[in-house]
C-alpha cells in the first residue's frame, strides 16, 4: 500500500516543476495552490504547509492520508508550525499538556544565495523520545547563514496519539513514523518548487529523531525518498526505541480514559477516537514512576504482518540481518556523556528536603532501574530484573552507595546502556550485513551549559559532553547557551560542511574538517572518528572505549 502511494505521489512530480517566480520569491506555486512565505533577511521561510489530512476524528489512530484540499486563496505560510499534542518533559510543573492534534505540517527554510540556482535538501526530524518535542525546538539560522542547504522540518504525531498500539491489525501503531514517511514523500514531490534538488535529499535527526532516521532507512524503499541519513545521538538499537509491551500499555490507557469495557483492539480504538485528545495525552502521567521516568512510555513497535500499511513487521536487528533494508550511506553518532540527559534529574535538589534525588536510589534501585534503563519489558521475571539490576550496580559502582560523589559512574552507566552500546551494536550489524558506507563519530567537547544543567537545575556540576552538545551546534536549542566558544564555532562550521558534502557526494564519502571518515562495512575493526575541541582523529577499535 505504501509503495502504491509512493508511485501515485511521484506521478504528480511534474506538477511541482514550476520554479519560484524570480520577481517575488515569497510566492510559490504548489499542486494545492499558491503560497506566500516570509523574508527573514538572509533566508526565506515557508512554514506550516500541510502534508496530510488532519489526524482527527475518524483519522485518529490511522495511517496519515495525503493532504487533498485545494486553496482558492493564497495560503499564508508565514505562521510558525504548531506543536503536536504532547505531555512535555521540558515543562516544569504538574500540567505538562501542550499542543494540538491537527499538526501534520512541514516548514521550509531557504537561504538567500544568488550564487546557487538550486540547493541540496536536509529533511529534519526533531527528537523528544517519541513523546514530546516540536519542529521549532531546533533553530535553523546557523544553517541558513552558511547559505548552502534548504532545510525542511517535519512535524509528526507523538506519544499515545502517535504510537499507541495493541500489536495487531486493529490498532497497529507507528502512526508517527508513517507521518514522517508521508512527509518525506511530500518533500520529494514538491521541493523543486522551492529551488531544492529532489535527487539530493538527506534525512537527519537527533535522539528520537536520529532513531526515526534509522527506522525510515530500514525500509527498502527509503532510497526512493532520500539518498542518505545521519542519526545523531539515537538509533533503532537503543533500548528505549522499540516497545515490547505496547499492547498492555494501550489497553491500560483505555482503562484510564474510560474505555475499559473494550473487549478487543477495534472496540478500544473506536472508543479512544471518541475521547478528547487532551484526556488521552494527559494520561501519560499515569505511566510515570517518578519525575518523567520512563521518558518513553509510548514509542515504535514491531507491527503484525497483517496490519494495514505496516511500517516494520520485524525487529530492527532481524531486518538488518536479513539485508532487506535501504542500502544507502548512513552515519551514526554518540557523545561521551550522552546519559547525562537521563541522569541529571537525579542531582536536582528536592524542595521538601534539599537533598538530591540520587540518594533515593539506595532504597529504590531495584524498583526504578528497570524503568530508568528500559529493561522492564524485556525481562520475563522479577528475579531476572533484580539480578540484572544488581549486576549493573556492582559493575559500575561496586560497593559504593548512590550519592553525588558516585554520580559520574551512574551517568556512565546510563550512557552505555541507553546510547553507546546500541551504537556499537548497530555498527557491528552493518559491517556484517551492509553494502553502502556506514560511518560513526564520537563527540567529546562539553558545552558551557546544556541538558545536564537544565534538568538538574544546577550550574555547579560538570556533566561532560551530554546529549545534544554536538547537535545544538548545528541546530540551535535553548537548552544550551546562545553563545558559542571559538572552538565551537569552528566545529559548527565543520558539521554544516560535513552535511552539505555528504548529501552532494556521488559516492557517499563523508568528511569532517581535514578528516575523512572511514567506512565500517566489511571492516574487522570499528572505524570511529573522535571529535574534540582540538580537532579530529580516526580511531580503529576492537570495541568502543
Swiss-Prot record:
Family: Belongs to the type-B carboxylesterase/lipase family.
Catalytic reactions on record: a carboxylic ester + H2O = an alcohol + a carboxylate + H(+)
Catalytic residues (UniProt): 207 (acyl-ester intermediate), 467 (charge relay system)
Superkingdom of source: Eukaryota
E.C. code: 3.1.1.1
Bridged cysteine pairs (disulfide): 84-103, 259-271, 515-536
Location in the cell: Secreted
Broad class of the protein's primary localization: secreted
Broad class of enzyme this protein falls into: hydrolase
Database matches in Gene3D superfamilies: alpha/beta hydrolase
Originating species: Drosophila persimilis
Keywords: Disulfide bond, Glycoprotein, Hydrolase, Secreted, Serine esterase, Signal
Glycan-carrying positions: 113, 421, 507
UniProt name for this protein: Esterase-5C
Signal peptide: 1-19
GO MF, one annotated term: carboxylesterase activity
Gene Ontology CC annotations of this record: extracellular region
Amino acid at each position: 500500500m505504501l509503495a502504491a502511494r509512493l508511485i501515485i505521489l511521484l506521478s504528480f512530480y511534474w506538477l511541482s516543476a514550476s520554479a519560484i517566480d524570480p520577481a517575488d520569491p515569497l510566492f510559490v506555486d504548489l499542486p494545492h495552490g499558491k503560497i506566500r512565505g516570509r523574508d527573514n533577511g538572509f533566508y526565506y521561510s515557508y512554514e506550516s504547509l500541510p502534508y496530510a489530512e488532519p489526524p482527527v476524528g475518524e483519522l485518529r489512530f490511522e495511517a496519515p492520508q495525503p493532504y487533498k484540499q485545494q486553496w482558492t486563496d493564497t495560503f499564508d505560510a508565514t505562521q510558525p508550525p504548531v506543536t503536536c499534542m504532547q505531555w512535555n518533559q521540558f515543562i516544569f510543573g504538574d500540567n505538562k499538556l501542550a499542543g494540538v492534534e491537527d499538526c501534520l505540517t512541514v516548514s521550509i527554510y531557504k537561504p538567500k544565495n544568488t550564487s546557487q540556482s538550486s540547493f541540496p535538501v536536509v529533511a529534519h526530524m526533531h527528537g523528544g523520545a517519541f513523546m514530546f518535542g516540536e519542529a521549532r525546538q531546533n533553530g535553523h539560522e546557523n544553517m541558513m547563514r552558511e547559505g548552502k542547504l534548504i532545510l525542511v522540518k517535519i512535524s509528526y504525531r507523538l506519544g499515545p496519539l502517535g504510537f499507541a498500539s495493541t500489536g495487531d491489525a486493529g490498532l497497529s501503531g507507528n502512526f508517527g513514523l508513517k507521518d514522517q514517511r508521508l512527509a518525506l514523500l511530500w518533500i520529494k514531490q514538491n521541493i523543486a518548487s522551492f529551488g531544492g534538488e529532489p535527487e539530493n535529499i538527506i534525512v537527519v535527526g537527533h535522539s528520537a529523531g536520529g532513531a526515526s532516521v534509522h527506522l525510515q532507512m530500514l525500509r527498502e524503499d527509503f532510497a526512493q525518498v532520500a539518498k542518505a541519513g545521519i542519526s545523531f545521538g539515537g538509533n533503532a538499537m537503543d533500548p528505549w526505541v522499540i516497545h515490547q509491551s505496547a499492547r498492555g500499555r494501550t489497553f491500560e490507557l483505555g482503562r484510564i480514559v474510560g474505555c475499559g469495557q473494550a473487549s478487543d483492539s477495534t472496540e478500544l480504538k473506536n472508543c479512544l477516537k471518541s475521547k478528547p485528545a487532551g484526556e488521552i495525552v494527559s494520561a501519560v502521567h499515569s505511566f510515570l514512576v517518578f519525575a518523567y521516568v520512563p521518558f518513553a512510555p509510548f514509542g515504535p513497535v514491531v507491527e503484525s504482518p497483517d496490519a494495514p500499511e505496516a511500517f516494520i513487521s520485524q525487529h530492527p536487528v532481524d531486518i538488518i540481518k536479513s539485508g532487506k533494508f535501504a542500502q544507502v550511506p548512513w552515519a551514526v553518532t554518540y557523545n561521551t556523556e550522552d546519559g547525562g540527559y537521563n541522569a541529571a534529574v537525579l542531582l536536582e535538589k528536592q524542595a521538601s528536603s534539599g537533598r538530591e534525588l540520587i540518594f533515593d536510589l539506595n532504597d529504590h534501585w531495584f524498583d526504578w532501574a528497570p524503568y530508568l534503563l528500559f529493561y522492564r519489558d524485556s525481562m520475563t521475571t522479577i528475579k531476572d530484573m533484580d539480578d540484572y539490576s544488581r549486576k549493573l550496580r556492582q559493575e559500575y559502582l561496586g560497593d559504593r552507595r548512590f550519592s553525588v560523589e558516585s554520580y559520574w559512574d551512574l551517568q556512565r552507566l546510563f550512557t552505555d546502556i541507553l546510547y553507546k552500546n546500541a551504537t556499537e551494536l548497530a555498527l557491528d550489524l552493518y559491517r556484517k550485513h551492509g553494502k553502502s558506507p556506514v560511518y560513526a563519530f564520537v563527540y567529546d567537547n562539553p558545552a558551557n551549559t546544556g541538558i545536564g544543567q537544565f534538568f538538574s537545575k544546577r550550574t555547579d556540576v560538570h556533566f561532560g559532553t551530554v546529549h545534544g552538545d554536538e547537535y545544538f551546534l548545528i541546530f540551535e536549542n535553548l537548552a544550551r547557551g546562545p553563545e558559542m566558544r571559538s572552538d565551537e564555532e569552528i566545529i559548527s562550521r565543520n558539521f554544516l560542511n560535513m552535511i552539505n558534502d555528504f548529501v552532494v557526494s556521488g559516492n557517499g564519502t563523508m568528511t569532517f574538517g581535514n578528516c575523512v571518515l572511514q567506512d565500517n562495512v566489511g571492516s574487522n575493526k570499528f572505524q570511529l572518528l573522535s571529535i574534540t575541541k582540538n580537532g579530529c582523529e580516526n580511531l580503529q577499535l576492537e570495541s568502543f572505549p
